[in-house]
């Protein structure tokens, strides 16, 4: 039965290959690639041969032995004279002159046995010789022809299609939607910085690290990860609302993409309005030459986004100021004690660091800080 199936499928595949109008394009592309590869190998061989001839025209390096990072012993041949040179970073010293009885073949054989070939030109030359062997050539070439009999060669990429909905709107096929989604991922960092609580959290963590006097502990990766997960925790009610009101209807094809974007922006806009000061909104409205609004829902994103970021920066610095005060007091006390004891050469930060860490641990600083940050957002 398998032989019958193969006997039915194989003729159709061969017929499709040799009767298709695209066979000329496939063959021309295949031979074009082969020709380019052969030309590239020929050019590289010529370049390597020119370099070898140019380097060995007057002086020939017979052997070389490395003694250190910048020290080596080299045997060179100038006409019939063989010199042993000691080479360092700043000097070249003549060590010995070999007798003319020593043949180059003996030295070359020792070099081949002791030292492996590390020259790129020699490796390329050897590769070209291996490639041009008949057995290797006969094994590689049939593979290119076998690719022609693979049915996947004729696979086509589905083109983008559009569909007209009942309400007259237009929607696109899934590949276009996927392309738009992947393109929108490039705006994810800007989304995290401009429309969530990430900015305030990461600034406060950075100021806390400076107040403690530990510029490398916790490391940046830990702070970014903690700020990211804390952002998802604080923004989870907003994200749930976006998921229910925008993504679910869009995935069920109840609304199109434009409506999903508009409905998804409403919860984010509400979150940003709750964190933004009125003074910042008035400032950017004045810069945009907009007098007033009937309600806050009419504020456009081009005014709300910079106002929200400005308010977040101001709030983050206010929280950082309150964090600095107890650690600053410890620094002043330690510096005063060291001055009174006459230990002016001892840096106060070295002595005050253990006291800062002890104070931060005793008051359960991380829990206190995370709780205060979470409660500082109006959701």
Swiss-Prot record:
Q: Look up and give the membrane topology term.
A: Multi-pass membrane protein
Chief subcellular location equals: membrane
Transmembrane region positions?
23-43, 140-160, 178-198, 222-242, 319-339, 357-377
Query: Keyword Cell membrane on this protein?
Result: yes
According to its UniProt record, where is this protein located? Cell membrane; Bacterial flagellum basal body
Q: Which cysteines are joined by disulfide bonds?
A: none
Annotated PROSITE patterns: FLIP_1, FLIP_2
Q: Which GO terms describe its cellular component?
A: bacterial-type flagellum basal body; plasma membrane
Keywords (alphabetical) are: Bacterial flagellum, Bacterial flagellum biogenesis, Bacterial flagellum protein export, Cell membrane, Membrane, Protein transport, Transmembrane, Transmembrane helix, Transport
A single GO BP term for this record reads: bacterial-type flagellum organization
Q: Which family does it belong to?
A: Belongs to the FliP/MopC/SpaP family.
What is the role of the protein in this entry?
Plays a role in the flagellum-specific transport system.
Give the protein's recorded name: Flagellar biosynthetic protein FliP
Species the sequence originates in: Buchnera aphidicola subsp. Schizaphis graminum (strain Sg)
List the top taxonomic levels of the source: Bacteria, Pseudomonadati, Pseudomonadota, Gammaproteobacteria, Enterobacterales
């Amino acid at each position: 039965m398998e032989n019958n199936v193969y006997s039915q499928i194989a003729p159709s595949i061969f017929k499709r290959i040799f009767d298709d109008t695209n066979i000329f394009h496939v063959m021309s592309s295949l031979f074009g690639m082969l020709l380019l590869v052969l030309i590239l190998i020929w050019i590289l061989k010529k370049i390597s041969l020119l370099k070898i001839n140019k380097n060995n025209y007057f002086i020939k390096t017979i052997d070389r032995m490395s003694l250190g990072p910048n020290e080596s012993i080299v045997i060179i041949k100038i006409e019939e004279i063989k010199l042993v040179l000691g080479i360092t970073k700043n000097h070249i010293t003549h060590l010995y002159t070999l007798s003319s009885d020593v043949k180059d073949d003996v030295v070359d054989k020792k070099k081949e046995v002791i030292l492996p070939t590390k020259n790129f030109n020699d490796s390329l030359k050897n590769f070209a010789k291996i490639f041009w062997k008949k057995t290797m050539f006969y094994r590689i070439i049939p593979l290119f022809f076998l690719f022609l009999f693979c049915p996947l060669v004729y696979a086509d990429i589905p083109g983008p299609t559009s569909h007209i909905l009942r309400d007259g709107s237009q929607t696109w096929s899934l590949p276009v939607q996927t392309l738009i989604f992947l393109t929108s991922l490039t705006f994810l960092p800007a989304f995290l910085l401009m429309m969530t609580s990430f900015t305030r959290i990461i600034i406060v963590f950075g100021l806390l690290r400076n107040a403690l006097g530990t510029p490398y502990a916790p490391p940046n990766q830990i702070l970014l990860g903690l700020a990211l997960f804390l952002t998802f925790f604080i923004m989870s009610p907003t994200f749930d609302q976006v998921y229910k009101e925008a993504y679910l209807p869009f995935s069920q094809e109840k609304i199109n993409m434009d409506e999903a974007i508009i409905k998804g922006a409403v919860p984010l806009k509400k979150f940003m309005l709750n964190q933004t000061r009125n003074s910042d909104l008035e400032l950017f409205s004045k810069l945009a030459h907009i007098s007033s609004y009937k309600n806050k829902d009419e504020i456009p994103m081009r005014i709300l986004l910079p106002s929200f970021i400005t308010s977040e920066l101001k709030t983050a610095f206010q929280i950082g100021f309150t964090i600095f005060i107890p650690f600053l007091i410890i620094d002043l006390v330690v510096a005063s004690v060291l001055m009174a004891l006459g230990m002016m050469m001892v840096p106060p930060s070295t002595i005050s660091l253990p006291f800062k860490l002890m104070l931060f641990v005793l008051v359960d600083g991380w829990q206190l800080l995370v709780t205060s940050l979470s409660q500082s957002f109006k959701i």
